[in-house]
Design a protein with these regions (language model features):
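Extracytoplasmic small-molecule ligand-binding "clamshell" domains
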Residues: 4-77, 113, 131-138, 143, ...
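Hydrophobic/proline-rich hinge and linker segments of small-molecule sensing/allosteric domains
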Residues: 5-10, 80-102, 115, 187-191
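Short acidic, glycine/proline-rich loop/turn micro-motifs
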Residues: 16-21, 104-105, 125
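Extended ligand-binding regions for polar small-molecule ligands
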Residues: 26-38, 96-120, 124, 158-161, ...
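A ligand-binding cleft/hinge motif common to bilobed small-molecule-binding domains
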Residues: 52, 56-59, 68-78, 125, ...
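Conserved functional loop/turn residues at catalytic and ligand-binding sites
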Residues: 62, 149, 211
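Short beta-strand->loop
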Residues: 79-87, 91, 131-133, 169-181, ...
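Alpha-helical transmembrane signal-anchor helices
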Residues: 228-230
């Protein structure tokens, strides 16, 4: 059995967190366990305090793998990516009294986005009129909108549904689902391990819609779309 070191997002509930005992739990954790059981690869978690620290560890090759992330031009500088495991739309979140947003490029507003995320990278480039407020966690992004310190946040549908329901952000709502901003979540593999990427892909293409939906259902009630572009 070969083993690989994995860096994760320690604060991305319900996708993944490191719990108080340092255990990797959540949707991504369960899917990665399923992949590792299909391949007989032992995956060891390298603990970090933040997603940004995980990115630094990955760049320093202190971990071979990065859990559940979008492929972006910046990340491709040091990572190669598996096939997408699943896609999850991003949604714009505002307060109950916020107007529906038809076109993000036409508005001036402040938007809270966690640092080091794909949306942080893309929104800076795509929407120069938006004032981006960098935050350290999902929770902080939702709180800033709730406390009127930011007008909006953009987060994954699964994250948003979970936070609004489970964490009681009941004065927040989904305002829009911007086109072409889905999360195509993959595993990132450091560039000098191309064989490892090929091995992971062998298991990823065998994952069924039912297997993934069953895992998602353990954490949140939401319908999942499988990416059919392998």
């Amino acid at each position: 059995v070969c083993s690989s070191d994995l860096c994760v997002d320690p604060d991305w509930e319900p996708f993944e967190i490191l719990d108080k005992n340092g255990k990797h739990v959540g949707i991504a954790a369960d899917i990665i366990r399923l992949i590792s059981s299909k391949l007989e690869i032992e995956i060891k978690i390298i603990p970090t305090k933040t997603w940004e620290e995980s990115i630094e560890f990955s760049k320093e090759e202190r971990c071979d793998l990065m859990s559940f992330l979008n492929e972006t031009p910046q990340r491709k500088e040091w990572l190669t990516f598996t096939e997408p495991i699943f896609k999850d739309p991003n949604v714009i979140i505002g307060r109950l009294d916020s107007p529906i947003i038809k076109d993000l490029s036409k508005i001036k507003a402040s938007i809270a986005i966690p640092k080091g995320t794909a949306m942080y990278e893309r929104f800076q480039k795509d929407f120069p009129k938006l004032i981006i407020i960098p935050v350290n966690s999902e929770d902080e992004a939702f709180k800033l909108v709730e406390e009127k310190k930011a007008d909006l946040t953009v987060r994954s549908m699964i994250i948003s549904a979970f936070n609004i329901k489970e964490k009681g952000f009941f004065n927040l709502k989904i305002l829009n689902q911007p086109e072409n901003y889905e999360n195509h979540l993959r595993i990132g593999v450091i560039k000098d391990e191309p064989v490892l990427k090929d091995i992971l892909n062998k298991a990823i293409v065998t994952l069924t819609k039912e297997e993934i939906q069953n895992i998602i259902n353990r954490w949140v009630a939401i319908k999942y779309e499988k990416v059919e572009d392998y």
